[in-house]
Amino acid sequence: MTKFRGCIDIHSGQVKQIVGGTLTDSDADLKTNFVATQPPGYFAQLYKDNNVVGTHVIKLGPGCDEAAEEALAGWPDHLQIGGGINHDNAEKWIKLGASHVIVTSFLFPDAKLDMKRLTDLEAILEPYGGKKRIVVDLSCRRKDGKWVVAMNRWQTLTDTEVNKETLEQLAKHCDEFLIHAADVEGLCNGIDEELVTKLGEWLEEGHLPPVTYAGGAKNIDDLALVQKLSHGKVDLTYGSALDVFGGDKVKFSDCVEWNEKMHK
């Protein structure tokens, strides 16, 4: 059954909601929907109090480690951490209280998928559960009617398509997938229905781990839409539309109520 999953996006040490396609090395290009006055720990506590499991904390660029550590400390062993994760720092983040590390760019040196990097990471984390601690982020952009994994803050397209074969290949070495539809991220103009439908089909056909979709969710009905399109196989994250992130389209309390109602 489709669940609401939370997010805490951190940029320059603050919790923010941004337009995904505008995240580059230059802050001049950045389009921001929301900058929180509350610290990251406030949002961690909010998710904890409402039992929004599987929430992810994403570090968007440098200067975010301290804020991310504060978030993890707010709900130890329950929040996933992503952004700049590699084999040198993954163990540190697990020790700091992350339930999972989320990896993207590290797996794609020179924009090409390197499976050895994933298996090496799995081996490093073996004392903590190995693959059960890894989420692979296959954030993607549309190209020629397909979805191509995008890295480097979603600016660089890789050689890897998001499809059933890719999911099956990676599933042997991870516990979950996180998929941001970067083209619609932060726009609140609706989810990529075609991608969600396909994800549901691929998950139904193969023995694949859970998938969380993020990007474009604009009203509470999107939870029911994702449930229908994916046959309950895909979970949904809300960002800029949520009232706790300054949005006026979706109430956080309604999302929590959905989880309680659907998962009694």
UniProtKB/Swiss-Prot annotation:
Q: Where in the cell is it found?
A: Cytoplasm
Return the CDD domains for the record. Answer: HisA_HisF
Identify the keywords attached in UniProt to this record, alphabetized. Amino-acid biosynthesis, Cytoplasm, Histidine biosynthesis, Isomerase
Could you confirm whether the keyword DNA damage appears in this record?
A: no
Question: What EC class is this?
Answer: isomerase
Q: Which GO terms describe its molecular function?
A: 1-(5-phosphoribosyl)-5-[(5-phosphoribosylamino)methylideneamino]imidazole-4-carboxamide isomerase activity
Keyword Amino-acid biosynthesis listed: yes
List all membrane-crossing ranges. none
Q: Could you tell me the EC number(s) of this protein? A: 5.3.1.16
A Gene Ontology BP annotation from the UniProt entry? L-histidine biosynthetic process
> Which SUPFAM superfamilies does the protein's record reference?
Ribulose-phoshate binding barrel
Q: Which Pfam family, an example, fits this chain?
A: His_biosynth
Output the InterPro entries linked to this UniProt entry. Aldolase_TIM, His6-like_euk, His_biosynth, Isoase_HisA-like, RibuloseP-bd_barrel
Enzymatic reactions: 1-(5-phospho-beta-D-ribosyl)-5-[(5-phospho-beta-D-ribosylamino)methylideneamino]imidazole-4-carboxamide = 5-[(5-phospho-1-deoxy-D-ribulos-1-ylimino)methylamino]-1-(5-phospho-beta-D-ribosyl)imidazole-4-carboxamide
This entry carries the following GO cellular component terms, namely: cytoplasm
Identify the metabolic or biological route this protein is part of: Amino-acid biosynthesis; L-histidine biosynthesis; L-histidine from 5-phospho-alpha-D-ribose 1-diphosphate: step 4/9
User: Which domain of life, per UniProt?
Assistant: Eukaryota
Which family does the entry's similarity section mention?
Belongs to the HisA/HisF family.
Q: What protein is this chain from?
A: 1-(5-phosphoribosyl)-5-[(5-phosphoribosylamino)methylideneamino] imidazole-4-carboxamide isomerase
Name its species. Yarrowia lipolytica (strain CLIB 122 / E 150) (Yeast)
Source organism phylogeny:
Eukaryota, Fungi, Dikarya, Ascomycota, Saccharomycotina
What gene, per UniProt, encodes this protein? Answer: HIS6
